[in-house]
């Protein structure tokens, strides 16, 4: 049955098409724009075609002029009294499911059609879920008028709506495009700020830029494409450029813009300024021995990684003499951890392999006297430390590492538990007597980045705090930790002035993109400096994000959150997607990520994000549950949480629940299907199907297993490696399961998906496998990521919304 839906200009909201035809009666109009026939130098063009008036329709006119247009509801189109003129008529369609339609345009003779700013050949439309602008550009002639009748025909009843409220759905395009922060840096006196940006344009091109701002006035002093950094003491910034004789080091006064060439022939390699500004510390690379291309020896598992045989060493470049003095020599990697404020001492770390015992890589920490080149060993062969920083006076060292660092002095787990090597801790080392104090043993958040501030002597750090990245300040004298009040769920980066109580930081939250702030560290008050989110989310409609936690059968509180679709109706039933990692870290409240939750919700799903046992940010005992469990306990948390969520929220259709995870989360997706039948669809991206093959073949398989399967090996614990592998339980899976994988993945090799896909095919189960050419563990190529994401959306639409249209459009059915 064919019904008509007539929309007048009084309609200010989207009306769902209740039938197969939508008549468009209200447009936004812009025009007329008079165009003239060009002067004809010749009678024909280069292709031997004569000029006809219809070619004026090809005259460029941006569809953006409609933004300033007026409403038009008449049947006879506006014309022009002056020869030929161009006009624009536009309207907006919206669909939360993939839809095909045919646009009927009657009455117009000379027109062009644009959908989302792109010229459309023909009137057949294939609309991915989004808010779409449709523009008809037509050519009028003086004294002649045209009428217009437009309708949209679709076989998918209720799939398309017509919008007139200037709002739009949040889509992957909003995730990919626009400007984001890439870093911040305060000048030593806190008066100026360097802000780094990264902009991605439609089509995938991206570019970086840097801005220098005077904070007091907000005045922009400079904008450049080079990467600029502050000198450590003087309020000047520096950058490098290619000069006639080689790489140049340029120093700039931010107030005057005056440039000084500090070094004319700067050596290659990464460098940092000494705090005293009289020398540069270089990290250099020495190439290791080469193998033949046609046949080659692999010395140890990591030798399969490109560049593994190369070694790093340190050198000091004297800015007065130009002498590049090597500081270290040998075949072990050496890197700098910190330089003392007086420039006298260097903290440096070395690494060495020890494959026969966990941990298989050992680190040593030295204090090197830059004058005598004599080194003092501070920490010897500790595989659990990760970094170190001097105290402002140089008498102590702030050491970062895991709970097992320094003999396990910072462990806080139950008897029989092995701590997670990814749970970040801080320790205080007194150089004089080598006494070590654990600073975060009873602190649940997992430390990420720490800075010892010279101004107030406090340690500022970010830490995973459940699903947030919170900002903290610690007094190293008594170990007291204070959480700082910030305006975002996640602090992604921060900078402290060397000589002033000023901090700059930026971050985002569950429902907004990047925003930049300054903070007075005495008053502890933040001020918004720049809001990139405002432009990214202009006119975008988002659903709500709410916290939801439950108590599992073991008595633990399992935290989570959920996202609702825009225009949520609690009386409806919605399909739900469950997202998790299930590995060593939480799924943070990033607004933009590999799995942008609001973009899923915009398609009509409730999205439940759960933080099961084993994640950092909840305390050492909780994160230790990741070790030697291989999904046991984690799966129970996800299953119990999903069931309880449905029980407490009647708006979820518990027959239409999907789940998705990547990497270890991909393993969890596969493993879950061997444990439960509550899911109607599942997606595993780059998931582990066999712990033994991943352990042996992945570049970091055996080393990550030091975290997840500490002191366990395929021969010593086959129950863990085999019985907990989905491949050996494939016959228990009955859920439609999609495997996604980059075919160049060196972390979790693509064979992990291939072998599981093969098993399910031989078992006659519903499954699909999509490989992404040339992509590694993450799908980072712009165009391929869009196709990858659409594949995910289409799989869920097929099984959770009973609509295979999108899937069949991407992967056309084949008779093979």
Report each predicted region and the residues it spans:
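Cap/lid segment of the alpha/beta-hydrolase catalytic domain
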Residues: 532-655, 662, 696-704
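Blade-terminus and WD-like Trp-Asp/Gly-His loop motifs, strongest in beta-propeller folds
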Residues: 128, 184-192, 228-238, 271-279, ...
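A flexible loop/linker signature enriched in serine peptidases of the S9 family
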Residues: 178, 197-209, 240-250, 263-269, ...
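Accessory carbohydrate-binding/adhesion or oligomerization-edge regions at the termini
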Residues: 20-74, 135-169
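Aromatic-lined ligand-binding clefts that engage carbohydrates, nucleic acids, or primary amines
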Residues: 99-112, 134
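Non-catalytic accessory segments flanking enzyme active sites
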Residues: 181-188, 192-197, 201-204, 281-284, ...
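Short loop/turn segments that connect beta-strands within beta-propeller blades
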Residues: 214-217, 253-257, 318-322, 369-373, ...
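Active-site-proximal cap/loop segments of hydrolase catalytic domains
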Residues: 609-816
């Amino acid at each position: 049955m064919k019904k008509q839906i007539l929309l007048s200009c009084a309609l200010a909201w989207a009306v769902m098409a209740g039938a197969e035809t939508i008549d468009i009666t209200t447009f936004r109009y812009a025009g007329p724009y008079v165009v003239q026939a060009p002067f004809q130098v010749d009678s024909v063009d280069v292709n031997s075609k004569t000029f006809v008036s219809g070619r004026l329709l090809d005259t460029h006119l941006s569809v953006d002029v409609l933004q300033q247009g007026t409403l038009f509801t008449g049947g006879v189109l506006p014309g022009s009294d002056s020869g030929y003129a161009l006009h624009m008529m536009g309207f907006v369609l919206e669909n939360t499911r993939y839809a095909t339609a045919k646009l009927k345009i009657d009455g117009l003779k000379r027109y062009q059609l644009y959908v989302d700013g792109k010229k459309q050949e023909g009137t057949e439309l294939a609309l991915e879920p989004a808010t779409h602008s449709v523009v008809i550009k037509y050519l009028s002639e003086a004294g002649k008028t045209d009428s217009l009748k437009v309708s949209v025909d679709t076989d998918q009843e209720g799939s398309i709506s017509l919008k007139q409220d200037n709002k739009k759905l949040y889509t992957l395009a909003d995730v990919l495009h626009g400007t984001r922060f890439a870093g911040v840096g305060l000048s030593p006196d806190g008066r100026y700020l360097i802000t780094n940006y990264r902009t991605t344009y439609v089509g995938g091109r991206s570019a970086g830029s840097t801005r220098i701002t005077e904070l007091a006035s907000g005045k922009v002093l400079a904008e450049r494409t080079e990467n600029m950094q502050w000198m450590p003491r003087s309020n000047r910034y520096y950058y490098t450029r290619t000069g006639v004789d080689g790489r140049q080091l340029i120093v700039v006064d931010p107030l005057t813009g005056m440039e000084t060439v500090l070094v004319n022939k700067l050596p290659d390699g990464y460098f940092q300024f000494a705090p005293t500004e009289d020398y540069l510390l270089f990290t250099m690379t020495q190439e290791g021995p080469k193998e033949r291309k046609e046949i080659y020896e692999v010395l140890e598992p990591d030798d399969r990684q490109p560049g593994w045989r190369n070694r790093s060493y340190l050198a000091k470049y004297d800015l007065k003499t130009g002498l590049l003095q090597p500081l270290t020599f040998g075949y072990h990697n050496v890197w700098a951890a910190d330089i003392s404020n007086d420039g006298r001492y260097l903290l440096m770390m070395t690494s060495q392999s020890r494959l026969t015992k966990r941990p298989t890589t050992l680190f040593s920490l030295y204090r090197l006297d830059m004058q005598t080149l004599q080194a003092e060993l501070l920490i010897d062969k500790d595989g659990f430390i990760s970094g170190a920083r001097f105290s402002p006076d140089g008498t102590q060292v702030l050491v970062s590492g895991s709970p097992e660092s320094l003999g396990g002095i910072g462990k806080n787990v139950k008897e029989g538990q092995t701590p997670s090597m990814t749970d970040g801790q801080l320790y205080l080392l007194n150089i004089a007597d080598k006494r070590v104090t654990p600073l975060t043993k009873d602190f649940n958040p997992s430390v990420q980045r720490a800075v010892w501030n010279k101004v107030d002597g406090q340690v500022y750090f970010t830490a995973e705090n459940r699903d947030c990245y919170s900002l903290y300040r610690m007094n190293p004298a008594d170990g007291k930790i204070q959480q700082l009040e910030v305006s975002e769920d996640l602090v992604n980066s921060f900078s402290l002035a060397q000589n002033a109580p000023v901090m700059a930081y930026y971050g985002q939250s569950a429902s907004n993109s990047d925003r930049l702030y300054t903070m007075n560290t005495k008053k502890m008050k933040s001020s918004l400096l720049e809001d990139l989110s405002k432009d990214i989310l202009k006119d975008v409609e988002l659903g709500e994000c709410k916290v939801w936690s439950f108590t599992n059968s073991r008595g633990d509180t399992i935290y989570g959150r959920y996202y609702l679709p825009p225009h949520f109706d609690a009386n409806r039933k919605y399909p739900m997607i469950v997202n998790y990692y299930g590995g060593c870290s939480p799924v943070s409240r990033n607004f933009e990520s590999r799995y942008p939750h609001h973009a899923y919700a915009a398609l009509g799903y409730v999205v439940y994000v759960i933080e099961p046992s084993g994640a950092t940010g909840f305390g050492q005992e909780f994160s230790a549950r990741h070790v030697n469990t291989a999904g046991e306990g984690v799966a129970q948390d996800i299953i119990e949480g999903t069931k309880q969520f449905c029980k407490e929220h009647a708006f979820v259709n518990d027959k239409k629940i999907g789940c998705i995870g990547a990497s270890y989360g991909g393993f969890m997706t596969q493993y879950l299907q061997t444990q439960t039948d509550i899911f109607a669809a599942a997606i595993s991206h780059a998931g582990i199907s066999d712990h033994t093959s991943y352990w042996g073949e992945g570049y970091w398989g055996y080393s990550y297993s030091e975290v997840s399967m500490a002191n366990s090996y395929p021969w010593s614990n086959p129950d863990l490696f085999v019985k907990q592998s989905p491949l050996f339980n494939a016959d228990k899976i009955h859920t439609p399961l999609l495997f996604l994988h980059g075919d160049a993945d060196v972390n979790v090799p693509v064979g992990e998906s291939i072998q599981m896909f093969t098993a399910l095919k031989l078992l006659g189960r519903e499954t699909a496998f999509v490989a992404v050419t040339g992509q590694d563990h993450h799908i980072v190529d712009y165009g391929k990521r869009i196709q990858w994401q659409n594949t995910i959306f289409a799989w869920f639409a097929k099984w959770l919304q009973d609509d295979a249209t999108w899937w069949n459009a991407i992967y056309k059915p084949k008779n093979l």
